[in-house]
């Protein structure tokens, strides 16, 4: 599925702003600069096991690295690689239906991204007048993921098991979902100068994806008998673990397992240390 038109338009506008700023910067006293850094933090997701609760989950550590190309004191381009680790359990939910479903997953998402940044005020590492600024960012990323679930202390990759009947003859079963995809990262942050060569960044960003399978839960229960016969007992065990069954039915085939058609999203919260990798500014600063 292609991104919504308004998301694409917003991204194009940002790129045009960056391009125009490069022309302006060539006429000023500002020299372009390059910085790089590393980030640590955590993340959360919005999906079947956490439908609408921001900043909820069993937070796991994440990390990454990046390089930033500052076109002037307002605009920059950042290329980054980041690992976000998610861990969720239905049993943590206050929703009785979700808690009764009793599923869980973990997912290590590796993401490569390119984003455009806009500083709220003029900012540059090494400029004593540029102590602090807020900033916005948006761009495009490519990510890979593989949800897993645990039985008796062993974690199993879920996509090959087809827990909703993917790749089997069960009713309404489709193909196995992709484990790579594109996302639109967007968010905001704050930059704090530490001296001539370094800075701290604090950032929150959402990733709008086009997959409903970060958690391996999307549509309807497959036939447990078909899963066991065609995909194996492990697929059947990890597909269904409800505490109480609707209508006392042993096989829930066709019953709702997730929210079909609602894509998952994930967010990243991080603190990063940034340092300048070209020469320290020595010219007089613009006032």
Please annotate each region the language model reported.
Residues 26-70, 147, 265-270, 274-280:
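Short glycine/proline- and aromatic-enriched beta-strand/turn motifs that initiate or cap beta-hairpins
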Residues 46-54, 97-105, 123, 169-176, ...:
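Extracellular loop and loop/strand-boundary signature of outer-membrane beta-barrel proteins
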Residues 45-51, 87-92, 125, 145-150, ...:
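Outer-membrane beta-barrel proteins
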Residues 32, 57-61, 108-112, 132, ...:
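Residues that define the transmembrane beta-barrel architecture of outer-membrane proteins
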Residues 74-77, 124, 196-200, 279-283:
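Repeated loop/turn-to-beta-strand initiation elements of outer-membrane beta-barrel proteins
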Residues 38-42, 65-69, 114-120, 138-140, ...:
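Residues on the lipid-exposed face of transmembrane beta-strands in outer-membrane beta-barrel proteins
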Residues 141-263:
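Outer-membrane beta-barrel transmembrane domain signature
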